[in-house]
């Protein structure tokens, strides 16, 4: 007589954590179970979902937040644990008496833009099947920067419109603001939306981190706001360099990539300061995903990349090399699908509800439609100058607002002084990775 497998699913993500703007959570789960995965694209907002139909389980997430799972073995069959954090999975396994099966490298990240299907059939567990639900057409816009800019900023403004519409008018809105292109575009688009709705811009604040008196971002932010006449929105959050703890950031984001650790470290300092000043503040927008969309990363810093690979590979910076590639990490995913934790995890640590409009499919689709190869003609310099032109022209055509354009600078470089950066960062990635593993050994 064949033994009947009894599978359990332990979902640690409450429905209240879903930020779906246009349907109930159960309706979104129904789309996840439908035959055509493209239906998941109808879900507006931020989500990390699981749906079950017998032995079949499907998972999907938006690009702005993580979704992880672990398959444990029980006497009667497999147990699937689903959470947005590795330590939550570890703790759940320990409570269920399966702590000995856990290792952080055995956890799996659901890759963004895919439906992940798992069959709970018991030992041996089959590999998951990935079915893409977001596949925007590439390079379909004309090589006209005015048209490109207008298309891209219209998509940005639509995401901001949907976000603002879902938040009670009494709730204040903040932007994590450096004066750079992406946070600047979000601030101007949000300011424009509030005016269009007949609401006071006093509801809005631009928060800038200043470590040890301020790095280059503080001066840049002040110049940006001065040139746009929005000085009244500015709030500076002061923090000492001693408060920057990259090892604490490793624990929060559960990753060890140096650039993400550095970004999360300064992000934690900024969010901590906002929370101390405003105990009840919830809603914060940021510019995360803007660099990925318009491919504004220095290719020279990555020996694995060429300009051809950057402009010719679909959503390279959003997804990494893709789920079919050898280099794709099962534990972490790739690209912003992995790096989303640098913003999401710190925000959740301090009780904020984060919003990254550049990470939404509507905006990414507008970016993927840009004919990058035709526009750049193999030139790094043209590629690096493209984002400023696209955003500046687009914001002017859509909102009538003039976007100040400054040279690119990473958040962790602009928020701190050079001396503070040298003192707090620059450790070898092995140190961060070892620290992450040690956290689970202690657990």
Regions found by a protein language model. Name each.
Residues 401-409:
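A short alpha-helix-loop-beta-strand transition element characteristic
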Residues 1-237:
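Cysteine-centered catalytic environments shared across enzyme families
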Residues 70, 234, 356, 404-405:
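A generic structural-conservation signal
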Residues 55-58, 137-399, 412-427, 436-442:
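ATP-dependent adenylate-handling active sites, centered on carboxylate activation for C-N bond formation
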